[in-house]
Amino acid sequence: MPRAAGVPSAIRRPICAPPPSSARRRHSVGASRSAGGGASMSFRGADFMNDSFTPVHVDDPMPHRKVIRSWITPFGQRVIARSIVLLVVDYLLLFAAFAGALLAPSSIVKIVCGMAAGFVTGRLFIIGHDACHQSLTPNHRLNRWLGRIAFLPSLTPYSLWEVGHNVVHHGYTNLKGFDFVWAPHTPDEFAALSPTRRFLDRLYRSGWAPGLYYLVEIWWLRMYFPTKTYLGASRPVFRRDCLLVTGFAAIWIGAVVWIAAATHQSALLLVVTGVVVPFLFWCSMFGFVVYVHHTDPRISWHANRTEWSRTAPFVSTTLHLTFPFGIGALMHHIMEHTAHHVDMSIPLYGLKDAQAKLEAMLPGRIVVQRFSWRWYFDTARRCKLYDIERKCWTDYLGRPTSDAHLRADAPMADQRPIDAPRDA
């Protein structure tokens, strides 16, 4: 029997990972057999790596992304009617929250309703985010329209988000010099910053100001009429989308002022409760979301593209944050984030099952964290700077606050955060 043509490239061992002892033993057994036996072993290895029911042991090599994606393909069915219903329901919730923010007799109730409007704005943004990935419906043209509609309350220009998020963030997650979202400075970079930028970095990473980070560093500098410093080459569609959200904001503010006059209320108060509070709550909500998606002492950043690509970044750079009381579902399952990075075509209503499948198939590989404020502020305390040379997080004094990642493909189970002294 001729020797098999070989195992498909999608299931070959990454070059950075030496075969574990068990694999070496299997190889030695296969080598002692005839050529036909060797072919049989090769095919069995291929079948094992492509098997969507047998979990991959933590010491085995990470399967190719194509293999991993094949496990969750069944959860990628997109339904137009379901997606439109989600959008309509969230807009109805938004109108109800705005009604409370503008018409409730109590100022406190107005503020609470304004915060609720900010939360629903976040839900609508997640729908738009799916549309921007072309994962909301199977119709690309419809996705572009629905995405722009869903992005209006958050004042997000669709085309600019598409480039910054889909191309840059998803294409180069946690790769220094490419991915800019919550990218940590190295100790040398931080030392070279101006006093103002050092102050801002400390404020952003204090745990108390994720909304300020999103408002300034993402929305203002990179989304809303960005300059060439942050945008590079411009396209007419960028300006059109910026004008679209600007027009929506003008109509929104004008309607609030008109309602204030019609109901004999303070225009300033209603602008605060019906415009400022919802927008700031939305910025805080999503600044928090994008921070916790990729920041944890067990998650690395990389400066070398080759090294980065060997770490299976679509799995190793993301965190699945779980919540009680169905909060994850209220956020349209955006926290099932590993599944989203493995396959961006999975719609939001398929992410929960897709994430569960990945965690069943890759035990010990995925960072899963139950949310608590203790964990959040401990992460904020540890994850100030990232030392590329030592491959660990540090505080602002350069003291390590996480284990060094000694192996590029080390399982998450071996990468435990360590205690570190608090900042002075």
Predicted features and spans:
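Alpha-helical bilayer-embedded segments of polytopic membrane proteins, i.e.
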Residues: 77-124, 154-156, 201-218, 234-289
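C-terminal regulatory/interaction regions
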Residues: 383-424
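Short, Lys/Arg-enriched N-terminal segments with co-localized hydrophobic residues
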Residues: 29, 33-47
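Short, charged cytosolic
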Residues: 42-67, 209-222
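Polar-ligand-bearing catalytic/cofactor-coordination segments
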Residues: 53, 71-73, 297-301, 353, ...
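Cytosolic juxtamembrane amphipathic/interface segments immediately preceding
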Residues: 69-78, 231, 354
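Conserved beta-strand-loop-alpha-helix hinge in the C-terminal portion
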Residues: 5-31
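Membrane-embedded catalytic scaffold of the fatty acid hydroxylase/desaturase
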Residues: 121-128, 132-242, 298-384, 388
